[in-house]
Design a protein with these regions (language model features):
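Short, exposed "boundary/linker" segments that immediately precede the start
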Residues: 1-2, 6
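Extracellular/periplasmic, surface-exposed regions of secreted and cell-surface proteins
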Residues: 7-10, 14-163, 297-378
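A surface-exposed, glycine/aromatic-enriched loop/edge motif typical of exported proteins
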Residues: 7-10, 14-26, 135-194, 248-276
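Compositionally biased, intrinsically disordered low-complexity segments enriched
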Residues: 12, 57, 226, 240-242, ...
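Outer-membrane beta-barrel transmembrane strand signature
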Residues: 26-69, 156-236, 277-318
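Glycine-rich, histidine-containing beta strand-loop boundary motifs that form or position
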Residues: 74, 235-239
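Short secondary-structure capping/turn micro-motifs that flank functional sites
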Residues: 121, 233, 241-242
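Extracytoplasmic gating/loop element in the C-terminal half of outer-membrane beta-barrel translocons
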Residues: 240-327, 331-333
Length: 378
């Protein structure tokens, strides 16, 4: 029994780290100013540096002589004194732009990885499953500050980060980075869209409601690798669940009547809303261009075949001794979307910035890549 226990023993490694980092404001200077523009700006020399505290706990465990491995990491970061910019009304001067330390944001989550490697007959198999969750929350918004010109107190209930027709993304205390608010249509007590009998159309409401967050609730990944007699097969499936996205592309095309949705509506004699048919032109001229953001808000859940490769090791060493191995492979990335409700790829990015995520505004479509590789080992 003791020998069996020793053979099947497991190894567990735990670690914990804590760090604090600072990020100073931009050092790029032009004309003795850190920013230049057409409107007057105040110098931002009094800004405090951005400050981040992070704590991470990890666990690594191996079972069955490391044929099965488990890795778990949990983390939390707190970033304070984030710099933001905004306009303040100044009597007799108009609006003046200035920078200020805006808020504190906490970020927490975990990642779980389960991997296995074993032989099934003559086939060697390596598999890896990952599951991760990440959440952020605005814990504190702008502390009461003084107007640098008038010396009066001012405070902000929210910081508007981006805005478009029928939508905007704010920072609010208790909210998260990536929150999207949209305009809606008038509804009855049961939540059904109200139809105006006179105009034979829906009724827009110029108030914003919370649509969701651009970030997923959780992500999953599955990677498998099989090898047999010089052949290799590898594939990766990636999935993100939850989150929302808004398509300005679809909204603009609907406005001009050049989308597939408007063509179908014309062929069907109108658009069915709450059991009533509305003329297609009336409906899309009113809600198009995302004037009603809820119409163009989509679930961002998607599952895709992210990567796949087939390879073969040519045994050239049998004939050419100075070449150890030749590996020929066919590789494809972003090959197949297995599930996606949105009319765009939710994983594609509109920019490298933070505040435009989840908004499809004529962003470039994602690409499917295919190629081959030849590797020689001497």
């Amino acid at each position: 029994l003791h020998k069996a226990i020793r053979r099947q023993r497991q190894m567990c490694i735990r670690d914990s780290t804590y760090s604090e980092t600072g990020n100073s404001f931009t050092d790029y200077i032009f004309l003795n100013k850190k920013r230049v523009g057409l409107k007057p700006r105040l110098e931002d020399n009094m800004l405090d540096p951005e400050h981040t505290k992070s704590h991470e706990i990890g666990l690594n465990a191996g079972f069955l002589n490391d044929k099965i491995n488990l890795a778990f990491t949990m983390y939390k970061t707190s970033t304070s004194d984030l710099p933001f910019g905004g306009y303040l009304p100044i009597p007799s001067q108009g609006d003046i732009y200035f920078m200020y330390n805006g808020c504190r944001i906490d970020n927490k989550g975990f990642e779980l990885t389960l991997s296995a490697n074993m032989n099934i007959g003559q086939v060697k198999w390596d598999g890896r499953f990952t599951y991760s969750i990440n959440k952020n929350e605005v814990k504190q918004l702008l502390e009461p500050q003084k107007n640098p010109i008038t010396d009066t107190d001012f405070n902000l209930e929210e910081i508007q980060m981006a805005k478009g027709s029928g939508w905007y993304t704010p920072l609010k205390k208790g909210g998260s980075i990536g929150d999207i608010y949209v305009t809606d249509l008038q509804r009855d007590e049961q939540g059904n869209v109200v139809i105006d009998k006179t105009s034979q159309n829906v009724v827009p409401v110029n108030e914003y409601i919370y649509a969701g967050n651009a970030d997923p609730k959780y992500t999953m990944g599955l990677a498998n690798s099989f090898s047999w007699k010089g052949f290799e097969l590898d594939f990766v499936i990636h999935a993100r669940f939850g989150g929302v996205g808004l398509s300005m592309t679809q909204a603009v095309m609907d406005q001009f009547g050049v989308s597939q949705a408007t063509a179908i509506a014309r062929d069907n004699g109108g658009v069915w809303v709450s059991g009533e048919k509305i003329p297609a032109e009336n409906y899309y001229r009113l809600v198009g261009w995302a004037r009603t953001g809820t119409v163009y808000t989509y679930d961002a859940t998607n599952i895709r075949l992210a990567e796949m490769s087939i390879a073969y090791h040519i045994p050239v060493n049998r004939w050419v001794k100075w070449i150890q191995d030749v590996r020929v492979a066919l590789v494809g990335r972003n090959l197949l979307m297995l599930y996606n409700k949105a009319p765009f790829d939710p994983e594609s990015t509109a920019s490298t910035g933070t505040w435009g995520q989840g908004i499809d505004n004529f962003r470039q479509p994602s690409y499917r890549n295919m190629g081959f590789s030849v590797n020689l080992t001497f």
